[in-house]
């Protein structure tokens, strides 16, 4: 039940709250880029139902973190970046992306700890390092995708 709740609740809240917050802050252009947010939310939802590999003989949530952590964050970052009209050099963009995935990963691990301690879920908390690696690799794949495709999308039109 925990997985179903999180996989549905988080994307719905994000899809409602983030655009409203950006519009309230005066970024009316966010609507133009909103499909990236919706794609991120769908990716997050799907990630909960993908199989993950055994690592060192233990069941992990590696794929969930790779897709629903790292790649999701990459799409969310791109949506926010475009909505804000923010551009920078690639090292600054990459740093901002890793800062975002790290912050969201930290929040996720705290939620997992809280769910375990409250008896809501029976997760093993021993795979945190693998979760960090999966999030980082997923966001790196998303950034490479951005470099290959996103910059082409961003280029000024004539």
Segments the model singles out, each with a brief description of its role:
Residues 1-126, 137-158:
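Bulky hydrophobic segments
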Residues 131:
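Divalent-cation-assisted or electrostatically stabilized phosphate/pyrophosphate-binding catalytic cores
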